[in-house]
Amino acid sequence: MPKTQAPYIPQTESEFTADWFSDCLQEQFGAAVLDVDLEIIGTGVGFIGEVYRCKLSWDATRGDLPQSVIIKVPSSIPANRGLGEGMQLYEREVLAYQKLSKEMALPMPKLFYAAMDDDPTPWLDKVIDFLFTYLPVRSVSWATVQFLKLAGNNPRLRRYLLMIEDIVDARPPSQVAGGSLDDAIVALSALAKFHATHWMSEESVGISTRICGDLK
């Protein structure tokens, strides 16, 4: 039986081309992307992933066409990548947008496109649980990257990608320096609404079980 070809999931700036955006968005919007202007807005210290703002030029002029979108992919820094994989942060975020965005009771950007490879190392979960129990986080990050490189027939790291709405008037606080008191009040207000919605909710337990089941 012929092997199924893996989907194309770009991970680097040079791969986010107009043709790729058209492939992802043309069916949704009935228009093609002609050009892309990329801006890195999050990478390096304090970031588990890399975040790009992509300004799109379309072959049509309509109010419903997004003028920019946000792309999120895993970090290229081994320690950050290892931590993200070890805690399943990339997979959880993709699944949350795909399956739970309407049920979270949190303001979330609109999802335009999401993709990730199948898990090539499902056995690794138990190993990572053991490492997190007995090793410091930095050691777990390094060990996770090494396991991922050695696991399976394909040494390439698992790919993840999110394309979401660009909230152009949003101001994300620094993940290193932290935010202001006003930022904390806004964040805690949103968390309070989330907590109130899901507290002692049997439906919410089902949502949690669904996500955990997809991660196993």
Which residue ranges define each predicted feature?
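Juxta-kinase regulatory segment immediately upstream of eukaryotic protein kinase catalytic domains
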Residues: 1-40
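Conserved ATP-binding subdomain of kinase catalytic cores across diverse folds
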Residues: 41-216
